[in-house]
Amino acid sequence: MPRCDIITPNTVEAAYLADMPEVTTVEQIKEAAEKIVAAGAKSVVIKGGERLSDNSAIDIFYDCKEFTEMAVPKIYPSYNHGAGCTFSAAITAGLANGLSMKEAVLQAKKFVTAALKHGFAINNIVGCTNHTAYRKYSE
């Protein structure tokens, strides 16, 4: 991880990377984030998503200095196929456009939230995020 400016694991991946049995609370996310950064990553966003709360989708950004909690209301139905990849790509786009890491992460959270809010069904089993939603709906 020393070559990583940022990594974006979900809670299951974060538990593995931090050598923890599980990550199911905000406190455990913070502990995992500190361990992941200690392993060499410069910053981390652990995507708790809908796993941590009954009402909110929670992600936590850590940059070796402070924790930033990003919580938005859960979205139903959540057509979330590709949401993690979309989030990482949106961070990369923000960085390429000159944003700081924290600014890029915060913008990416807004982008993915809009993409999920306006996601669509592909068939009766799965749906995907709407990558045009952030710009189209000015969210």
Model-derived features: positions:
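Short pre-catalytic strand/loop immediately N-terminal to key active-site residues, enriched for Gly-Thr
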Residues: 67-81
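Histidine-centered active-site/metal-ligand motif
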Residues: 50, 81, 131
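Short, charged, surface-exposed loops that flank catalytic or proteolytic processing sites
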Residues: 22-29, 96-106
